[in-house]
């Protein structure tokens, strides 16, 4: 019978041999320009493949009570502007849903929407935006409004040109889509969301995927460990999309609508930038929507736990990846507006290629 020490030594030798063999094979694949990350990722996913549960709402364990502290921690993850926010509103006649910045003078005689003279909120001299409060966030999370008019949206681009998170939006924002809560018309969008999730994983990013309130769209959230210049964050986002176009074989990426923040900076003091509706909307969550989902499209049972487990990216990580992924067209497109910038899957047809910093005050 072998000595235990001898057994351990033999096992260690076998492990070393396997690691060496593994590295040699990886080098051969790298030299041949063959990627093994996609196959490895798919294998790992298949290992944990779980059937889709049709009862998505029942999977979720809802807290018996949502406290002000929970609301504060929630906003700490989705930290947008605090001096202005938006709420969902449904037109009683048309049934269309839209999000409006909240104003102290809304629908008073000083409100141009009531007067209907065509003046936008940002050009209104009487605008007096409301600041977001813990009560607003609690109402959003509790979801007691029958028509979801308690759902809030935030503006990710802060007034100083920084942001604390980024989002890839796979909702339908075509004209008329507001009638169905911005739902996509078919299920092909799911393939693109999975591709974007895989792109993140392949490049060392652990994203949080949310199924939208319609159940027919998604948001992919990436959190940052401190306020970072939106211009840098957007350069990182564009570089990630370009890198993904090299790694993932997709015929198109037509359901990807936009990346937020959608601007590098605000054009003036009256500008707000694009808004994004926050997840964990109490009413939609009952049906398993506005919920965080795994790679099998099943809602996580403990939504709060998965949210707070997600890592935050540092500025150093973003800068390193931008440098690593840089290519000749970066200088051309770095400052492009989202609507003007050609999507990478289209462009590929033409080219070869710890702790949060800051103080949060919500009253």
Question: Model-predicted segments: where are they?
Answer:
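Signature for HUH/AEP ssDNA processing cores
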Residues: 2, 57-216, 223-239
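Acidic, low-complexity intrinsically disordered tails
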Residues: 38, 42-65, 330-362
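DNA replication initiation modules
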Residues: 151-190, 194, 225-352, 356
């Amino acid at each position: 019978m072998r000595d235990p020490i001898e057994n351990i030594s033999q096992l260690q030798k076998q492990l070393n041999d396997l690691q060496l063999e593994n590295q040699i094979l990886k080098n051969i694949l790298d030299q041949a320009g063959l990627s093994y990350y996609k196959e490895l990722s798919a294998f790992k996913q298949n290992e944990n493949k779980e059937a889709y549960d049709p009862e998505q709402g029942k999977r979720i364990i809802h807290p018996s009570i949502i406290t002000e502290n929970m609301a504060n921690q929630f906003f700490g993850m989705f930290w947008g502007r605090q001096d202005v926010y938006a709420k969902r509103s449904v037109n009683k006649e048309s049934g269309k849903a839209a999000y409006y910045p909240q104003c102290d003078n809304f629908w008073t005689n000083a409100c141009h929407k009531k007067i209907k003279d065509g003046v936008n909120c940002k050009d209104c001299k009487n605008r007096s935006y409301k600041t977001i409060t813990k009560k607003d966030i609690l109402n959003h999370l509790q979801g007691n409004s029958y028509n979801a008019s308690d759902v809030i949206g935030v503006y990710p681009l802060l007034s100083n040109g920084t942001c604390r998170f980024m989002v890839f939006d796979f909702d339908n924002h075509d004209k008329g889509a507001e009638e169905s809560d911005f739902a996509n018309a078919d299920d092909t969008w799911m393939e693109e969301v999975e591709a974007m999730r895989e792109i993140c994983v392949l490049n060392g990013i652990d994203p949080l995927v949310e199924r939208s309130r319609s159940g027919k769209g998604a948001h992919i959230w990436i959190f940052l460990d401190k306020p970072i210049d939106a211009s840098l964050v957007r350069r990182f986002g564009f570089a990630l999309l370009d890198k993904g176009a090299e790694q993932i074989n997709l015929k198109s990426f037509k359901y990807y609508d936009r990346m937020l923040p959608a601007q590098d900076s605000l054009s003036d003091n009256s500008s707000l930038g694009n808004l994004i509706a926050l997840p964990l909307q109490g009413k939609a969550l009952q049906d398993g929507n506005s919920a965080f989902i795994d790679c099998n499209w099943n809602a996580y049972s403990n939504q709060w736990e998965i949210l707070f487990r997600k890592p935050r990216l540092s500025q150093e990580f973003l800068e390193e990846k931008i440098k690593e992924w840089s290519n000749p067209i970066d200088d051309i497109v770095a400052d492009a507006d989202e609507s003007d910038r050609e999507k990478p899957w289209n462009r590929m047809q033409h080219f070869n290629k710890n702790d949060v910093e800051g103080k949060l005050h919500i009253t």
